[in-house]
Amino acid sequence: MEQNSRALIDGFNRKIDYLRMSVTDRCDFRCVYCMAEDMQFLPRQQILSLEELFQVAERFVALGTRKIRLTGGEPLVRQGIVDLCGRIAALPGLRELCMTSNGSQLPRLAQPLFDAGLSRLNISLDSLDAERFKQLTRTGDLAQVIAGIDAARRAGFQRIKLNCVVLKGRNDDELVDLVRFAIDRELDITFIEEMPLGVISEHERGESFCSSDEVRARLAEQFTLIESTESSQGPARYWRLAEASSTRVGFISPHSHNFCATCNRVRLTVEGRLLLCLGNEHSMDLKQVLRAHPGDAERLEKAIRDSLHLKPYRHHFEVGGDVQILRFMNMTGG
């Protein structure tokens, strides 16, 4: 009863029980849809310390959060990330600690992360062609990422999920091959419509947009898709494959089928801004609270609760429209 009475409820009666925490804005890739090629990263004093990140996680779990996802940038380039995972995973009441990674550091870190208590991994994979993969990531090594995926499987992670951002004319001819790759390794895969965050020069977003409906129609030419009621507590909607019971295909559709009505999420940027919506700038500065009142759990809890009235009902992303959010995805928490 005490947990219910302390639950985080926004102004539209949505229960907030999922926190996405960015632990760094830095990354060893420069993906074309995520950041500028010459990205300027934040100085260390501007980002939350590992202890500050833990304090926020601890307070959210005390307020009923049951799922935390660690993001970046690339979370595995943050020194001390394995220890942070261990501390957060041990919080009483937390059901799931997940991470989204580009996979490059998993050959050496998959086993330590699993041993520390990380529950699940999402791994970005936008192409199976080495040259194309390098073009999309600007610096990435496909073989290294595949080695990371295999290391995660050996470490014991279950329900590993691949994330693919679909860009028309750049990787949309690989949809079937990516699903077959997932089937071969008994992985889930989610296809994502590009998020319109930050001004990019690599491609015109309106021209590169590929809707989830189009992706699903193309896959249906090769596979039998069975709609599922399963949920990962996030925005993805899943289909089962008649041809492969161990693989689910998901779709995240911020443009064509937005998931705002049931949104249960907030995001913490590495600067300590609590973002109430991916597509809005409404935020609460938790870093200011953490540093002005170190160790004061009550003040931190009050700031979190006070922020909920800022959460809007929905975002207003438009395909091909003007960029409304200037922060890049790596600054938001991917």
From Swiss-Prot:
Protein name per UniProt: GTP 3',8-cyclase
Necessary cofactors: [4Fe-4S] cluster
Associated pathway: Cofactor biosynthesis; molybdopterin biosynthesis
Catalytic reaction(s) noted: GTP + AH2 + S-adenosyl-L-methionine = (8S)-3',8-cyclo-7,8-dihydroguanosine 5'-triphosphate + 5'-deoxyadenosine + L-methionine + A + H(+)
Record's subunit section: Monomer and homodimer.
Cofactor, how bound (note): Binds 2 [4Fe-4S] clusters. Binds 1 [4Fe-4S] cluster coordinated with 3 cysteines and an exchangeable S-adenosyl-L-methionine and 1 [4Fe-4S] cluster coordinated with 3 cysteines and the GTP-derived substrate.
Molecular function, one GO term: GTP binding
Domain Radical SAM core: 11-236
Top-level EC class as recorded in UniProt: lyase
Coiled coil: none
Listed InterPro entries: Aldolase_TIM, Elp3/MiaA/NifB-like_rSAM, MoaA, MoaA_NifB_PqqE_Fe-S-bd_CS, MoaA_twitch, MoCo_biosynth_MoaA/MoaC, rSAM
Keywords recorded for this protein, A-Z: 4Fe-4S, GTP-binding, Iron, Iron-sulfur, Lyase, Metal-binding, Molybdenum cofactor biosynthesis, Nucleotide-binding, S-adenosyl-L-methionine
Pfam families in UniProt: Fer4_12 (PF13353), Mob_synth_C (PF06463), Radical_SAM (PF04055)
Binding site for S-adenosyl-L-methionine: Y33, G73, S124, M195
Residues bound to [4Fe-4S] cluster 2: C260, C263, C277
Protein's GO biological process: Mo-molybdopterin cofactor biosynthetic process
Residues at which GTP binds: R20, R69, T100, K161, R265, V266, R267
Role noted for this protein: Catalyzes the cyclization of GTP to (8S)-3',8-cyclo-7,8-dihydroguanosine 5'-triphosphate.
SUPFAM superfamilies: Radical SAM enzymes
Family: Belongs to the radical SAM superfamily. MoaA family.
EC id: 4.1.99.22
